[in-house]
Each structure stands twice: as C-alpha cells, then as structure tokens.
Amino acid sequence: MTIKLGIVMDPISAINIKKDSSFAMLEEAQKRGYELFYLEMKDLYMEGGRAFGTMRPLTVKYDYADWYSLGEVVDQPLSSLDVILMRKDPPFDTEFIYATYMLERAEDEGCLIVNKPQSLRDANEKLYTAWFAEHTPTTLVTRRADKLRAFHAQYKDVILKPLDGMGGASIFRMKEDDANVGVIIETLTAHGSQYCMAQTYLPAIKDGDKRVLVVDGEPVPYCLARIPAQGETRGNLAAGGRGEARPLSEADWAIARAVGPTLKEKGLIFVGLDIIGDRLTEINVTSPTCIREIEAAFDVHITGMLMDAIERRLAKA
C-alpha cells in the first residue's frame, strides 16, 4: 500500500534546498514511493467538526533552479492522508495552536501527525526543559523584575531570553557590571506583562551550542555544534554562528537517553535538543533542523531513521 504523506510548511518556493530539513524529509519519502501532498497553514480548515486540507500533489528534486512541482488542487479530509509532517516554523502563536487543533481532529480519525499536536502545545521549547531540570542550567522563569534582578545579583553572569523566540532572537547576556540590566528586563518582560527565562551563563558556549537530534526516542549519534561568531554569545546559525558536525559526547548521550523515552511516549517523533557543554537548554519540537549539515559530514541517514519510525508507527496503527 502506498503511503500518503502530507506536509504543512512555510512556502516551498522560498526554501534553501541545500539546508532545508523538511525538503530532505520529502526527498526520502519520495524515494520510498510515498505520495506527497503539500499544504501551508492557510490550507487547513474545519467544517462540520472534521479537518480538511486544500492540498496539492507534490514532487521534489534536488535542482536549485526547479526543486518542486505541484499538481492540481485536491480538497479532502486530512484523514485521507496516512501521515502529516507539521513543519511550520515558529512563531508558536495562536494561529499555530489553532492549526494543531485541526491536525488533532485528523489524528482522531487515524492520521499520524509528526509531531503529535497535543504535545506540540504542551512542550514549549524553552519551558519544557523544566521537566528535566537535573540536566539544565540553573533557571528562573518569571515576569517580575525584582526576581530577575535578584537572580542576576546571585549568579553575576546570566542569560535572559523570551519564551517564544527562535534563531537566537532577543537573547541577552548580562554580566555582573552590566549597565543595561533595567532596560533588558523591561524589554523582555514588556514591563512585567510577559514571562521570560533567566539562566546561568554557560562558558562552554564558546565550544558550541550543540543540536542533538532524537528520532522516535533514539539519539542520532552525531550533532551539529553551532559555534558563536567572534564577540557573540549566541551560537545560532541564524545569528552568524558557524556549524561544525561532530560525534555526540558522553554528556550528550546521557542527556538524549534521559529525555528520549519521554519524547517517544508523547509522540514527539522528531526533536532537536540544544545542549551547551553538559547542560540541556532547549527542546525543539516544532520544526527542528540541521539534518543536511550532519548528513553531509557523517555516514548517517537521519531522514531514513525518521521514515523507518513513521512506517513502524503506521504498521502498529
């Protein structure tokens, strides 16, 4: 039986196929003979309590000039598909949440959603690390300026970041003698109206912020270390960091194995852990990336691991 796979993503016309993990997934699925269907968020809708999609058949090829083609529009229930990859990038806003409810209706009718819609809502990429606090830096989440100031006074060198950012946006390092503590706190909490996260600064960032991929609970044995540019605190590639693929360290393995079973149980089939030194800083569940960079450096088939996991789950359904 041919597997029908849908993908919800940002416009495919604007992606960089050399780096795009979603495109790598589509290539592997197509190689296996899956039928591919393309959707954007605007193509999801509900009617009469059922979730539908205005979708188009999709074919892909690794060609910088002509990497995809779309067939005629098909309007049909999302549950007509066997599996849907939810690969829409953050922001994780109310529109994203509404989309997860629609995907959950399809899940109720037997469609496998990667990642599980309820777990996408439950697992905020920064806050969810609190469930594994023994592996994280010392962390405070609050909107109160006095608590943030006290945290800074106690630990001297801290990182402040919003709970909904991506790509290193709005991440601030506050050293002991920082003259901008007040304005940084005001900015990130929107004058006390929004939560933000404070963590102790990890000097190991100079060796890279490591992206460790976990596929259906199993760690990929290689990671991508994102090394900050000169004078930068952030390793994110989007913030000018340099990527360097490397094998997992013992600490990476320990963290990934500690977190993996819970991720699998929650239906979080494709996840990116962010690890600095031996500390877990984020659990990325919405649209993790770095497949291309790791596969280019090592003999590892991450998209194959993912499709194998999907096929195993479909076989059990």
Predicted regions and their residues:
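Structural detector of well-ordered beta-strand residues that form the stable sheet scaffold
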Residues: 37, 113-114, 159, 197-199
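Redox-cofactor binding/interface segments in oxidoreductases and associated redox assembly factors
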Residues: 7, 85-86, 199
